[in-house]
A protein has these predicted regions:
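Small-residue-enriched segments and motifs
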Residues: 27, 81, 95, 144-145
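C-terminal boundary and immediately downstream tail of ABC-type ATPase nucleotide-binding domains
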Residues: 76-100, 128
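ABC ATPase nucleotide-binding domains
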Residues: 1-82
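Glycine-centered flexibility sites
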Residues: 63, 69, 88-90, 95, ...
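Secondary-structure boundary/capping residues
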Residues: 38-41, 92, 155
């Protein structure tokens, strides 16, 4: 940095850093790069690291740039199934478009929201469902079996199995009064509304 290069390349700069120090170093690195005003390309396989450090993120798969956008859009508005699979932050479920603002899935029922890309009514699509898209409700009559539960500090990530054997991830705040065990039934709040409907 002392030489003030026009372009700085950091290839997996934090890959060997212990997790307990990683976030602290990420924070310091972000401040240094911002203050230096040097254009920096950071190569990483950690999407969370890329989202935190980058003002723009590029997803490269099979030597091709699949998406280049701000971190929010890469996460919430992936432009291909390849990007969805690479990020591994949700699941794709079959659905049918029933109106300009709704679609139907045989397990979840009617889902409303804003389509990021228009589809003709009657189209068979794959709907991206991310962990934050569905909300827990113990009183709901729409219940699925819990097959996995991961504690992530501020939240749990539940994996639910639907009658059609689809696995759907759902976030629940860790302070929620009732935590569900494996094999228990988990209620999903209705009506289901997803702000950004992403389909392929």
């Amino acid at each position: 940095l002392m030489t003030q290069p026009d372009l700085l390349l950091l290839d997996e700069p934090l890959s060997n850093v212990d997790q307990s120090f990683k976030e602290e170093i990420q924070e310091k690195l972000k401040k240094i790069l911002k203050n230096s005003k040097i254009t920096t390309v950071i190569v990483t396989h950690d999407s969370y690291e890329a989202f935190y450090l980058g003002s723009r993120c590029g997803i490269i798969l099979n030597q091709e740039l699949k998406q280049f956008d701000d971190p929010y859009n890469v996460y919430h508005l992936p432009n291909s199934i390849e990007v969805v699979n690479f990020l591994n932050r949700g699941t794709l479920i079959p659905a049918e478009v029933t109106s300009p603002k709704s679609l139907e899935n045989k397990d979840l029922g009617t889902i409303t929201g804003n389509f990021m890309k228009p589809f003709p009514i009657g189209s068979k699509v794959k709907l991206l469902v991310q962990p934050e898209d569905l909300h827990h409700d113990d009183k709901s009559n729409l219940k699925f079996e819990v097959v996995d539960r991961k504690f992530r500090g501020t939240n749990f990530i539940y994996t639910l199995k639907t009658p059609s054997e689809t696995l759907i991830p759902v976030f629940v705040h860790s302070h929620h009064i009732h935590q569900h065990e494996i094999d228990e039934k988990f209620g999903i709040k209705r009506p289901i509304h997803i702000d950004h409907i992403v389909c392929f």
